[in-house]
């Protein structure tokens, strides 16, 4: 789908015929504005409040029209703090939705929801802008061919492979490693595929946003010496922002990604951390707008809001957007309406397990809960499919035997079951992997493991060729050759101790 980005002078030119209203009511981030009869703005139009507060400080607040109330009043949601606003202040209707800069000028820079740079590196070329509200590509423009997107992370590539141009969800509670996994994916994809990425930080910690930026500069994903050669654009609407900004920042990031897909005809990666915060912000705004809450206090328009964002993330004949979204699961409950609604849109799910994280298995991806529509013999091939199924069967059998082991001990198991448990424990450890972005914490260098190497490694474990090796040799290594080398080192160390 071709975008029609506007190539024009700055927004000021659209304000020549100013359509002015006045603030009638302020409730937190929600403003009611009165306009003259016949001059009502459209839904989603951007309104600008300019002036000075009681202390004489300059105010410049952008809002978005959400409701037409009647009696020439509209209700709008502010995209920044409403401190200092007063009733009676003038409001300018810009006559258009929020528009943000797009194209090469966005690479290597950090933006807020309005498309304004917030990294103190000077202004951005805003000659090419695009509105954040657009319809999804028409059915006839979609591209339907299926291909795997290799990530270099063993557990992902083997058991829940990602689809090129698909939508992937990272599910997990607080502190199990969603953001670290996203950072590793950005790192691997920039280095292995040379693709352009757009990162949307939606309602997450400002510290994490800053850490990610520094990490990208260190790893060369953002090129400080020549910003234009950077591989990623960052859009942040963090926890401290009003709900309006957190609700729309995902659309700002998506608009930038769509331009790379439709006009530059590139394959783009869109990271959203965290899609739950998008729903949460929508819930806050919905309550402020006076809508009746739905299940568990969520907004009644939850499915519609999610659909309007997710349906724009797709592959067209021009290019693709592959989206990887972190999904916070409230109280680890996958049946909560927010994660449950997200599930419906995904091609693959990577579920992070607190039990594995507690064991020190990182990435803590649950091999049994994680799924992918791509894991079919006709797509990935018989060898990959068979290996993945056998890994899952072995892990499932180990899970079933854990109660018996806890009560009676390993000795009460049959010979066959003991062998299954030993292999399952090796598989569990071999599914861990040292990350490039976690080198600082783990002290071991990161590893990128190709799909062929991953399949070979698990086939060797399942065949029984490596039954003699200790299970700790498989922990936090790259390919299977490193595991055998580590086993030899462990043997040498144990002999020296004796």
UniProtKB/Swiss-Prot annotation:
Any one GO BP annotation for this protein: proton motive force-driven mitochondrial ATP synthesis
Chain coiled-coil ranges: none
HAMAP family: ATP_synth_beta_bact
Catalysis performed (reactions): ATP + H2O + 4 H(+)(in) = ADP + phosphate + 5 H(+)(out)
Protein name as catalogued: ATP synthase subunit beta, chloroplastic
Subunit relationships: F-type ATPases have 2 components, CF(1) - the catalytic core - and CF(0) - the membrane proton channel. CF(1) has five subunits: alpha(3), beta(3), gamma(1), delta(1), epsilon(1). CF(0) has four main subunits: a(1), b(1), b'(1) and c(9-12).
Superkingdom per UniProt: Eukaryota
Record keywords: ATP synthesis, ATP-binding, CF(1), Chloroplast, Hydrogen ion transport, Ion transport, Membrane, Nucleotide-binding, Plastid, Thylakoid, Translocase, Transport
Subcellular location: Plastid, Chloroplast thylakoid membrane
Function of the protein: Produces ATP from ADP in the presence of a proton gradient across the membrane. The catalytic sites are hosted primarily by the beta subunits.
Principal localisation: plastid
Residues at which ATP binds: 172-179
Membrane topology reported for the UniProt record: Peripheral membrane protein
NCBIfam families named in the record: atpD (TIGR01039)
Disulfide feature: none
GO MF annotation list: ATP binding; ATP hydrolysis activity; proton-transporting ATP synthase activity, rotational mechanism
Signal peptide start and end residues: none
Name of the top EC class for this enzyme: translocase
Family: Belongs to the ATPase alpha/beta chains family.
Gene Ontology CC terms: chloroplast thylakoid membrane; mitochondrion; proton-transporting ATP synthase complex
Organism annotation: Salacca zalacca
EC number per UniProt: 7.1.2.2
